[in-house]
Amino acid sequence: LITERVSTDLEELIIDGGTDGTDDYLSLVDGVFTLSTSNVLDFSDETDDVSKHIFKAGIVSMPNKYLRKRDAMRFYVSPNMELEYADSLADRATPLGDANIQRNMFNYAYGVPVKPVSLMPDAKYLFTFPKNIIFGVQRDIMIESDRDIRTQVLIVVVTMRIDLAYEEEDAVVTASGLSTDFNQPTTTTA
């Protein structure tokens, strides 16, 4: 359980980190969206649903020198966005549409895999090579525990030194302001 919690916390820091933020934890290091400054797309004025057009804009924004190995790149999206994109493909009256409904397929946008990341915000995506994201952890990882006998809680603190960077910052496209209206059903409480 400790490793799962640490991986979740690190994923949150990698995605949402920003040293100018107000959250003590997230301000420890700049995350992938904060570090990306060259190719930033803003879809705030768009009202389109998740479709191929948002992915096309990311590919067009990527410098041509990196597109030679497009199949090695990834679109990192939220699970909701990945599901919405799969649903848009499933609406097609073709074998691809049928396959998206019947099987858990890996979806592609213009030859680039679309991968869901559990803590990715719904309104954002990241387009880059997986190996372009450099995440470093110092060897000295300290695990400390304490027990609060009154509340019967075991407290575990994991301390480590980390850093995050891009090997090639201009080989990253980030998008924000994407539509988050995923046609979710209205729930009522009794």
Regions inferred by a protein language model and the residue ranges of each:
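Sequence/fold signature of self-assembling virion shell proteins
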Residues: 30-50, 86-190
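Hydrophobic alpha-helical segments and helix-packing faces
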Residues: 51, 55, 75-78
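Short, conserved, surface-exposed binding loops centered on an aromatic residue
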Residues: 63-68, 104-106
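Long, contiguous amphipathic alpha-helices that act as assembly "spine/axial" helices in icosahedral shell
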Residues: 1-36, 66-82, 114, 141, ...
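Phosphate-interacting basic helix/loop segments used at nucleotide- and nucleic-acid interfaces
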Residues: 52-66
